[in-house]
Amino acid sequence: MKILLANPRGFCAGVSRAVETVEKVLEVEKSPVYVRHEVVHNKVVVDSLKKKGVVFVKEVDEVPDDAVCIFSAHGVSLQVEEAASKKNLVLYDATCPLVTKVHRGVRLASNNDAECVLIGHKGHPEVQGTMGQYRSEKGAIYLVESEQDVAKLDIKNPDNLYYATQTTLSVDETQGIIESLKNRFPNIKGPKKEDICYATQNRQTAIKSMLKEIDVLVVVGSQNSSNSNRLKELATLEGIDAYLVDNPADIKSTWFENKKVCGVSAGASAPEYLVQQVITEISRVCEGDVVVEEFDGIKEEVYFPLPRLLKQKIIGTN
């Protein structure tokens, strides 16, 4: 059997920055180090950081006063920021810069008393953080997940309206909803196209480009990873068997019976070493009869610098 490796795959710049932030904070600060929410949606990464002394909490209320705390890559609401400030925490913000861009857009809309529509998945931590950027008493922020939701919107002033999107959605996922918004509210304003997360789109494009070449797909990523689930869905929608795995132990030999080409990719929160371990396990269950090839794709060269406070601490300790 042949294994085709999707490109790009795995860690995006925002995830790399978040994980590196936690690891560097562990070096420059005294334990324990608290992280609000899973820093990224990957069980293996989170478990590894727990072993190094990181304490993950759901809310800042669980963090002792004056302690060291990190915000996850998904970002937080203004209410969470204020709660952290009251506790006098040593705070490092690992929010993805692309999420921060979305936050700025929503806050600007709020400051202008414009109502806001957010395209995203209900309950996702990024969505909760973005919704929590809106404070205007003269308007509201609405969450839509489908074109049907757009039809139900009751907007107070359609001439002063803004929309934003969850970063882990792709252009393909949001296109129909955005068109529905523009059809119903012709004066609605939105972000620039380049504000859309490059990583989500690139990883989905990579999968789409190899679908005609494969008859089974394995995606390395956790069940609670939005972008990993989308990668799997791209294959299943085309009638291709697809599986989402946290680690090599999830691999089953029956998946590859009578299969000729297996595609392998990874969500934006999955490290490359996990991908290589999964490949090794696939080769083992296929009794070594495997050839591995890289599938050509977009080359990513995006880098996000560490939080300013952390860079200052690193310089101060050297």
Swiss-Prot record:
Annotated dimethylallyl diphosphate binding sites: 41, 74, 124, 225-227, 269
Residues that, per the record, bind isopentenyl diphosphate: 41, 74, 124, 225-227, 269
Binding site for [4Fe-4S] cluster: 12, 96, 197
Binding positions ((2E)-4-hydroxy-3-methylbut-2-enyl diphosphate): 41, 74, 124, 167, 225-227, 269
A GO molecular-function annotation: 4 iron, 4 sulfur cluster binding
Membrane-spanning ranges: none
Active site: 126
Stated role: Catalyzes the conversion of 1-hydroxy-2-methyl-2-(E)-butenyl 4-diphosphate (HMBPP) into a mixture of isopentenyl diphosphate (IPP) and dimethylallyl diphosphate (DMAPP). Acts in the terminal step of the DOXP/MEP pathway for isoprenoid precursor biosynthesis.
GO BP term (any one): dimethylallyl diphosphate biosynthetic process
Cofactor section: [4Fe-4S] cluster
Record Gene3D superfamilies: 3.40.50.11270, 4-hydroxy-3-methylbut-2-enyl diphosphate reductase, catalytic domain (3.40.1010.20)
Family: Belongs to the IspH family.
EC annotation from Swiss-Prot or TrEMBL: 1.17.7.4
First-level EC class: oxidoreductase
Pathway: Isoprenoid biosynthesis; dimethylallyl diphosphate biosynthesis; dimethylallyl diphosphate from (2E)-4-hydroxy-3-methylbutenyl diphosphate: step 1/1; Isoprenoid biosynthesis; isopentenyl diphosphate biosynthesis via DXP pathway; isopentenyl diphosphate from 1-deoxy-D-xylulose 5-phosphate: step 6/6
Reactions it catalyzes: isopentenyl diphosphate + 2 oxidized [2Fe-2S]-[ferredoxin] + H2O = (2E)-4-hydroxy-3-methylbut-2-enyl diphosphate + 2 reduced [2Fe-2S]-[ferredoxin] + 2 H(+); dimethylallyl diphosphate + 2 oxidized [2Fe-2S]-[ferredoxin] + H2O = (2E)-4-hydroxy-3-methylbut-2-enyl diphosphate + 2 reduced [2Fe-2S]-[ferredoxin] + 2 H(+)
CDD domains recorded: lytB_ispH
Cofactor: how bound: Binds 1 [4Fe-4S] cluster per subunit.
Name assigned to this protein: 4-hydroxy-3-methylbut-2-enyl diphosphate reductase
Record keywords, A-Z: 4Fe-4S, Iron, Iron-sulfur, Isoprene biosynthesis, Metal-binding, Oxidoreductase
